[in-house]
Amino acid sequence: MKSLVGGVVLWGLFLGWNSASAAADNAVECNSAGARLVEQGKLEAAIAQFQKAISLDAKYFPARLNLAYAYEKMNQTEEAIEAYRAAIDAQPRNFFAHNNLGVLYDKKGLYDSAITEFKTALQIESGNSMARKNLEIAEKNKGAIEKRAARIESAEKEARAKPNDPRVSYNVARTYAFYGQKESAFEWLNKARKQGYKDLEYLKIDPAFESLRNDPDFERLANP
């Protein structure tokens, strides 16, 4: 799978924000402090500052976006997704929130949701090359997953039609191995061997099993 690009979202003192109260002023200060902490790599402390900013002024949008970004940098994907959704609820036409949420959805394999977010981002900024590239990659990733699922289903369908054929079981094993699904590959390879698959010389050089070649279980199956 290809990787996508999240927009750089780190807003310190948001100059376009007109505070109307001491609480709002304090929210701006907390957000700025959080932004500095992110730059220093102190993400947990930064998150606390962004959360404090939001508690002081729920309408202060930069803190919401920065909170999501900090969670993302900490690889706390679920928390980041929730924070980006909250940011979108607060400001539905924010480009960065939609783009970065799309990146996280793609990371989780939720390609339809990712594609929807990138399309929304492009409705907001139609000429943005980052979002357009992300959309292209998400669509390709979705296509690759669908192709993988179709190949696996085709192999297993043949196995269901020929449940005692070791060559068919072997083909299912190599299909799983090709896509890096180790446990399923070994399950079907063991089945093929029990059914009488004997071409061990080919098994040892079959490129589909390259990712399993150094695994002790593979060594055991290839050299009984």
Task: Give names to the regions the model predicted.
Residues 6-16:
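Bacterial N-terminal signal peptides
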Residues 26-28, 61-62, 95-96, 129-130, ...:
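Helix-start (N-cap) detector for alpha-helical repeat units in TPR-like alpha-solenoids
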Residues 31, 38-39, 65, 69-72, ...:
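Position-specific recognition of the canonical hydrophobic site in helix A of tetratricopeptide repeat
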Residues 56, 90, 124, 161-162, ...:
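Structural marker of alpha-solenoid helical repeat scaffolds
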